[in-house]
Amino acid sequence: MKIKTRFAPSPTGYLHVGGARTALYSWLFSRHLGGEFVLRIEDTDLGRSTQEAIDAIMDGMNWLNLDWDEGPYFQTKRFDRYNAVIDQMLDAGTAYRCYCSKERLEALREAQMANGEKPRYDGHCRDSQCTHGADEPSVVRFRNPQEGSVIFDDKIRGPIEFSNQELDDLIIRRTDGSPTYNFCVVIDDWDMEITHVIRGEDHINNTPRQINILKALGAPVPEYAHVSMILGDDGKKLSKRHGAVGVMQYRDDGYLPEALLNYLVRLGWSHGDQEIFSIEEMTQLFTLDAVSKSASAFNTEKLQWLNHHYINSLPPEQVAVHLSWHVEQLGIDTRNGPELVEIVKLLGERCKTLKEMAESCRYFYEEFDAFDVDAAKKHLRPIARQPLEAVKVKLAAITEWTTENVHNAIQGTADELGVGMGKVGMPLRVAVTGVGQSPGMDVTVHAIGQARTLARIDKALAFISEREAQQ
């Protein structure tokens, strides 16, 4: 049997982390078994579906490198197919027209709730012999079995059973002629030969209805697996209140796709005590029986830890490609300075995100307007004039600009002055970067370049002179 899974988001908002995890699990399951993965856009909610949301879904999937073998399919382009099946069901008697008014249905609902009953359709039109005009508004309902039960073996949760008496006759076509979500899903899974439906636990109650429709059509029933929800660190359902955002916001905030994928796969799935998984390892190891039934809590600190790991473990060239986007967003021109690969090597240990790295690398490429106030107050004092003048002479004398020669110049200055490296290095750091923290001075000065370094030392010496004049 060819394995075939699908990811079927509704384009009513961004691709959130819960949806991304579902997509990842479906993708991994199919890839692990050599199957196919389908992308389907369930846009039947015409009032809420937007092109912007569709674009956000596609951008998120592409950024995460979750490629698909078929699609994207759009439900709004398949209405003729859905309605043709509904007409066949009307002819076969597995569906019927319902002419109940909104007023009758509302009164029924209120009466049931007043009696402590679960609101459900009472089947008024199910076996009605009443005649109605051809133009009288009606919906079409599925004739759900009234006896027995629906049992399915959830691949994460085990056997789940629903009594058919608990399931009312579902509307499958509205009065305006449009098919409903629960029906479209069934026909899509049938037509697209989906073998395994992996989705959120909020769809469990839809499953028995969908299975009954499939059986009425004589269609194969796929396997189902319902993934538990993701909670915030306070134990409540993850929402915007917890900072839950679309997948692309994580890109904007400086996270690598490899880090987010690694984090998402571990939100419910495990393989021993292993924490770090490449996409190749995930594909090789992923199985549904290792997915937990329990809800998972989203922890931003853990994601940052993983991101820092991948910044420093992936090839610098690969990280630099992602970094370039962030640098461009800040308007930094990198043509006059070190390659971004060097920035990754220099700042990787210090930065948890690429956004932080981009914001920290500006002094490698641009002149700064002013020194950091606290750093200058502490390190650009009159006492710093001598070490800055001395190290400038040695740096200016270098004919081969290497990290080793820069280091020797700084160390040699400290030795000649009989002071510790910090007495030279800290004023030099503030002079050439404008701030009080940076990577080691030898690699930083080397990356900034000889001419720019000497000019910045002059700027710092002028600053010290101005400071002296004001005292």
Curated annotation (Swiss-Prot):
Its cofactor is Zn(2+). It catalyses: tRNA(Glu) + L-glutamate + ATP = L-glutamyl-tRNA(Glu) + AMP + diphosphate. Belongs to the class-I aminoacyl-tRNA synthetase family. Glutamate--tRNA ligase type 1 subfamily. The lineage of its organism: Bacteria, Pseudomonadati, Pseudomonadota, Gammaproteobacteria, Enterobacterales. This is Glutamate--tRNA ligase. Its main location: cytoplasm. PANTHER family: GLUTAMATE--TRNA LIGASE (PTHR43311), GLUTAMATE--TRNA LIGASE, MITOCHONDRIAL-RELATED (PTHR43311:SF2). Gene3D superfamilies: 1.10.10.350, HUPs. The gene is gltX. Its EC number is 6.1.1.17. Binds 1 zinc ion per subunit. It comes from Yersinia pestis. Monomer.
